[in-house]
């Protein structure tokens, strides 16, 4: 979920314009659902973004592919927006635009996006308990977890939200213990 600052700066006006338009046209729920589904789809099929981001592929070819694969799956306005991105040669920013747009929606709806890195996948019960605790800590009505599994953490989990990082990993505890022992043994 880390975003290139330059890409974010370029993508932000597009996300804001789509957000404003979707609110104005009363289609925010449809566009949001489209973007949530697209986000999952792009994560599952990374070759699509490689193709769309390829400068050798013409805008016409990109439009044809999107028409074939996504037109029937998306709200008409969402699809038109994708075509605008292709025409303006900004389709490569789609993942960043999606993230920025969803952040705007979640901020409005008091939904917090929280990144969690864990050594092992969470069970459903663990996820629900973590969401419950995070709701209490953040006063958000809803929490959206973005979970990544990172076996280098050894055990535990790491929570990132906005500028806060809460580290409950065994790797961090071992590093802290090593620092403490280094300090004690330097007599």
From Swiss-Prot:
Belongs to the ATPase delta chain family. Pfam families: OSCP. InterPro entries: ATP_synth_OSCP/delta_N_sf, ATPase_OSCP/d_CS, ATPase_OSCP/dsu. The keyword Membrane applies. F-type ATPases have 2 components, F(1) - the catalytic core - and F(0) - the membrane proton channel. F(1) has five subunits: alpha(3), beta(3), gamma(1), delta(1), epsilon(1). CF(0) has four main subunits: a(1), b(1), b'(1) and c(10-14). The alpha and beta chains form an alternating ring which encloses part of the gamma chain. F(1) is attached to F(0) by a central stalk formed by the gamma and epsilon chains, while a peripheral stalk is formed by the delta, b and b' chains. One of its GO terms (biological process) is proton motive force-driven ATP synthesis. Its main location: plastid. The keyword Transcription does not apply. It is a peripheral membrane protein. It is found in: Plastid, Chloroplast thylakoid membrane. It comes from the Eukaryota. GO terms for cellular component: chloroplast thylakoid membrane; proton-transporting ATP synthase complex. This is ATP synthase subunit delta, chloroplastic. Coiled coil: none annotated. One of its GO terms (molecular function) is proton-transporting ATP synthase activity, rotational mechanism. Keywords: ATP synthesis, CF(1), Chloroplast, Hydrogen ion transport, Ion transport, Membrane, Plastid, Thylakoid, Transport. F(1)F(0) ATP synthase produces ATP from ADP in the presence of a proton or sodium gradient. F-type ATPases consist of two structural domains, F(1) containing the extramembraneous catalytic core and F(0) containing the membrane proton channel, linked together by a central stalk and a peripheral stalk. During catalysis, ATP synthesis in the catalytic domain of F(1) is coupled via a rotary mechanism of the central stalk subunits to proton translocation.
């Amino acid at each position: 979920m880390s975003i290139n600052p330059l890409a974010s700066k370029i993508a932000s006006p597009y996300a804001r314009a789509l957000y404003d338009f979707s609110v104005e046209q009363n289609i925010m729920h449809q566009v949001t659902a489209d973007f949530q589904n697209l986000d999952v789809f792009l994560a599952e099929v990374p070759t699509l973004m490689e193709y769309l981001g390829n400068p050798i592929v013409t805008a016409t070819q990109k439009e044809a592919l999107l028409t074939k694969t996504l037109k029937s799956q998306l709200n008409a306005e969402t699809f038109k927006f994708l075509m605008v991105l292709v025409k303006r040669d900004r389709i490569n920013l789609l993942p960043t635009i999606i993230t920025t747009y969803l952040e705007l929606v979640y901020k409005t709806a008091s939904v917090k996006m929280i990144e969690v890195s864990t050594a092992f996948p969470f069970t459903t019960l663990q996820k629900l308990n973590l969401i419950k605790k995070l709701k209490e800590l953040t006063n958000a009505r809803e929490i959206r977890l973005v979970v990544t599994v990172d076996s280098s953490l050894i055990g535990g989990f790491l929570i990132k939200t906005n500028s806060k990082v809460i580290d409950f990993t065994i790797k961090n505890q071992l590093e802290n213990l090593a620092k403490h022992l280094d300090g004690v043994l330097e007599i």
